Amino acid sequence: MDGTAIYAGKKTEVVAVDLLDANLASNVTRQIYGQVVGLNIYDGGAGGLQLNIGGRGLDPNRSANFNTRQNGYDISADVLGYPESYYTPPPEALSEIQVVRGAASLQYGTQFGGLVNFKFKSPNPNKKIEFISRQTVGSYDLLASFNSISGTLGKFSYYNYFNYKEGKGFRPNTSFNSRNYHGHFEYLLSDKTKIWFEATISDYLAQQPGGLTDAQFQDDPTISIRERNWFDVSWLLGNVRLEHRFSNSTEFSLNLFGLDASRSALGFRENRVLSLDPGEERELLIDNFQNWGTEARLLTRYKIGQQDAVALIGSKYYQAFNRQRQGAGPATAGPDFSFVDEEFPTFARRSTYTFPNLNLAFFGENIFNITNRLSITPGFRFEYIKTQGVGNFTRVFTDLAGNLISTDIQEEDRTNERSFLLLGIGAAYQLAKQTELYANFSENFRSITFNDIRIVNPAQIISEDLEDETGFTADLGVRGTVNDLLRFDVSGFMLYYSNRISANNQIIDEFNRVRNITDNVGTALILGIETVADINLKKILFQANNDIKLNLFLNSALTTSEYIQSDLNNAIDGQKVEHIPEVNIKTGLRFGYKNFLGSIQYSYLSEQFNDPLNSEPFSDSTAPNAGIIGTLPAYDVMDLSLSYTYKNWRLEAGINNLLDNSYFTQRATGYPGPGIIPAEPRTFYTTLQ
């Protein structure tokens, strides 16, 4: 348990950020999450501005299949309709990152991926003021500055930081600058009650070099043929939290949170990666997100006979109103996010949508200690969801000279109202003092999102029969420690995924044109064995020398998958599920002598597909989906991180992609592509704290 949360019988992992030797300034995900098992990661984002993680066959794009939170409240654009995370807290500000797999659907939402919760550092309770400054420089003009101030004054405490980051990236037409502020202000009303307020402001602007075809990547992965593509994000989060302890056995928490945010994408974005930018008007898409919610939790400890028990009940209210507009942007080169539809009446991509959402949830879990060793934790979540999509897409018809003939406005008005009950159960059995057998089963649900139902491209079709995705997750494993020599967690999982949605489905329409349809493609079954082990070699080899630190770690996921039912005329029956490498391994050494510490990590992922048909890459670079559809080749990458501490000073340095391997982890269907997004080559960084 943690406050008013229950984790008994669940697959849980915690990243202790302060103990990491990693490139925190650039938010290098494979290093920070190196011991979180089975994650599939997109590596193509310069500066680590966004978090892109998936696992167990879930698309890593902007971590949309996880419920992402900070200090227990939602931070994504729209939890149901647009669960993408454009904002990610800087790792330097975090004490830990909590990851709970699919069984988190009962307490935190319905997602298949589970929960990722970023816990910020707490105010320093022993000082009135504490100032920490971290300055980083690195390859490709990377400059990052992180500064925090913290302290306690009687009943009042605070933690604030400001983070600035800029750089250029390794490809032409790549640059970014970001600013993040977070303020935490806490007041102790009594020895049983405290209240705090948090505000987060995040803003970044990035120039995007576009994607590549397979042939372009093989010839030169550093090239760019997009000079006018820009991406801008503005994020404002607020939260008020009340915590009250009624007694030593009963605790209550209440979060009241809200979001006011926007994301703007501007550039030349054609379906064919090889299409050259003519320097005319650009496509502009602006999404505005406004949502608010409240979540209350009550946890109480009680007895059933002689055995302890714990009950948790909670409820959540969430309301969102989001707007999206697409149209012509200026025919200039810079980041001017202004619509100029009147100036370019023949621009072919124009749409306007509103997406109101309403969500009510009630949930509960109870830990029953059957014996001193065995506990069972059943739970439920009742959901009421109402999602709407109202708007239109304008089709433009021109003559051969490009003159406007007519327009056809396609109206969309979709309302989807549903309520359902999700059930789950977990169990834990104490095999030994420090070893536990655990198991859990939980139903999952993924709502149709805005991207699933809005048309932004004349070549796109939305199925009239599109349905929500449903399924369940099950885990069975053993975890524990052995005499301070070995820490381990070995488990098997099964994920059953019905009505899986994909946009990478091609059909030929009545005019013999190739078009992409967003539809439910079938039912997927995913099975895997996940292992995390950490061996304390110091205890074995250098037991008498307390100045030495030496640990060997292994993080492996062996996964198999298959579409067991096809909704597309049996086209995908027996095919492998996309976004799943059958072998996913991260291993390495953490070493140190006195105040000198370091780590070296090796990562390997086998080949994976990015569409349900398991398509091979297009040999013809002029094909409509060349660079967008195809396999993701196997790749490996090695990282080295070092640090030295002297009194209040700390020096960090490292090399990312030590072997300078050329690889990619993403074939983007839209921004930041479309096409292959190459990962960074060998880079260096140095941080002074």
Model features per residue range: what roles?
Residues 103-105, 115-151, 160-162, 169-171, ...:
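Short strand-turn segments of transmembrane beta-barrel domains in outer membranes
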